């Protein structure tokens, strides 16, 4: 739980080309992005670092991005180096206990998207991320690697509801949003 435990975080954002409802912007093949920031790479790490900076944390992050010709979900490959030794069992326990994280053994974005459509609140997965369990790896007790999917719509819906509740009820917003907890997977 110590934010100082993170030595560095590297990740690749594999973005969907466009949303299912969009009629334009689809690409015919994978397209790589550029590193627009020398320190952070793509804007994703820069945005993440800025967010964590509001909490007083100065994280060593770097990201790359690319788009693929899919309309389902973004995919994130991550590699985290930590100071304290850890294990795959410990990582899985922490992820399973985090209500904002969904765990799956499905390895296709279409399967996870379909699950959300069939079982989610109005077809949406409200969790912030869906980690693919069998992709998790711990190397030398200090390096954590894996893949996760981003349920784009549900992610922003929950964030927006949380932000509105925080604005209205800054001391009790966490209690207020618990009415949605049964919708997390």
PLM feature spans:
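N-terminal Rossmann-like NAD(P) cofactor-binding subdomain of oxidoreductases
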Residues: 1-23, 163-167, 171-184
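C-terminal substrate-binding/catalytic lobe of Rossmann-fold NAD(P)-dependent oxidoreductases
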Residues: 5-148, 152
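Composition- and surface-driven signal marking solvent-exposed, interaction-prone regions
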Residues: 90-94, 159-162, 179
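Long, low-complexity C-terminal extensions of enzymes
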Residues: 145, 149-157, 161-164, 168-175
């Amino acid at each position: 739980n110590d934010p100082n435990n993170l030595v560095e975080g590297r990740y690749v954002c594999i973005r969907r080309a466009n949303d299912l409802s969009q009629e334009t912007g689809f690409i015919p093949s994978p397209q790589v992005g550029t590193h627009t920031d020398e320190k952070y790479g793509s804007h994703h790490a820069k945005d993440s670092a800025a967010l964590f900076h509001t909490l007083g944390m100065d994280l060593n992050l770097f990201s790359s991005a690319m788009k693929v010709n899919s309309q389902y979900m973004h995919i994130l490959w991550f590699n985290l180096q930590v100071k304290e030794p850890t294990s795959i069992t410990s990582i899985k326990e922490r992820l399973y206990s985090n209500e904002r994280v969904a765990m799956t053994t499905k390895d296709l974005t279409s399967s996870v998207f379909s699950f959300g459509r069939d079982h989610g609140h109005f077809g949406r997965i409200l969790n912030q991320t869906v980690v693919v369990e069998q992709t998790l790896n711990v190397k030398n007790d200090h390096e954590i690697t894996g893949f996760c999917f981003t349920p784009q719509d549900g992610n922003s819906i929950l964030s927006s509801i949380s932000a509105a509740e925080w604005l209205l009820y800054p001391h009790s917003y966490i209690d207020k949003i618990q009415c949605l907890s049964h919708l997390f997977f």
